[in-house]
């Protein structure tokens, strides 16, 4: 999509910087990775995701794309339309999308905002029916494979594994985890004088690493 931006070897100074890093990572990854499913996550407790999602939608539009911003529920989509009237024609909820849209919408990039385990079936159906790119912002799909039969669990794990994390920033008890496309995963250790890079990994570490 665009020329890759050098990846910093330190954590962003503030949330505004992290948000810009996320936008650049998404734009850099579109067309640069083989996956049609990109995930971007800012995992801060109490984060107001709506304005971040709307600004990402605007950044995608400014880059020449025609995104459809999808919220799982109608109430959140209605609030987004009120907050960003300039984007209201691009904002839908899952039911509106699944019920049928204009033919051209089916080829647009989908920006799905925070799908939860309870949205799993609807979201998977939307993704599998969509021929274009899907960008998932702050999704929580991993928990959708818990508490179901083994066959369904394996199918869901396969769907979860189909996503490429182009951006990830997560505070940890003793540090932080970050990935900015196209770089590796970076683990930071929290020291008395700040955060220091502790190492890099080619894939996301699990909770036991």
Which residue ranges define each predicted feature?
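Redox- and metal-dependent alpha/beta enzyme cores, enriched for Fe-S-associated oxidoreductases
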Residues: 132-149
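Short, surface-exposed basic-aromatic patches at helix termini and helix-loop junctions that form
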Residues: 61-62, 82-88, 104, 124-131
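A short acidic, amphipathic alpha-helical/loop segment
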Residues: 52-56, 121-126
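Conserved mixed alpha/beta catalytic, RNA-binding, or beta-rich assembly cores of soluble enzyme
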Residues: 100-102, 113-116, 125-126
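Electropositive, gly/pro-rich neighborhoods at or near active sites that engage anionic ligands
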Residues: 2-82
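A conserved mid-domain beta-alpha-beta active-site/ligand-binding segment of alpha/beta enzyme cores
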Residues: 145-209
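Short acidic, S/G/P-rich loop/turn micro-motifs used as interaction or catalytic elements
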Residues: 44-49, 75-77, 109-121, 140-144
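A short, well-structured beta->alpha microelement
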Residues: 21-24, 71-107
């Amino acid at each position: 999509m665009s020329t890759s931006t050098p990846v910093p070897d330190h954590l962003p100074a503030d949330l505004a910087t992290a948000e810009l890093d996320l936008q650049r990572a998404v734009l850099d990854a579109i067309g640069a990775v083989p996956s049609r499913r990109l995930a971007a996550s800012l995992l801060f407790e109490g984060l107001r995701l709506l304005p971040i999602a709307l600004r990402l939608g605007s950044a995608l539009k400014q880059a020449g794309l025609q995104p459809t911003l999808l919220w799982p529920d109608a109430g959140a989509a209605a609030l987004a339309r009120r907050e960003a009237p300039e984007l209201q024609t691009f904002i839908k909820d899952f039911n509106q999308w699944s019920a049928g849209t204009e033919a051209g919408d089916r080829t647009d990039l989908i920006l799905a905002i925070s799908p939860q385990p309870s949205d799993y079936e609807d979201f998977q159906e939307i993704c599998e029916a969509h021929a274009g790119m899907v960008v998932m912002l702050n999704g929580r799909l991993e928990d959708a494979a818990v508490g179901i039969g083994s066959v369904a669990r394996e199918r869901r794990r396969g769907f979860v594994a189909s996503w490429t994390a182009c951006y990830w920033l997560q505070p940890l008890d003793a540090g932080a985890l970050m990935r900015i496309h196209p770089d590796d995963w970076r683990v930071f250790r929290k020291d008395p004088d700040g955060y220091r890079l502790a190492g890099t990994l080619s894939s996301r570490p699990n909770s036991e690493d």
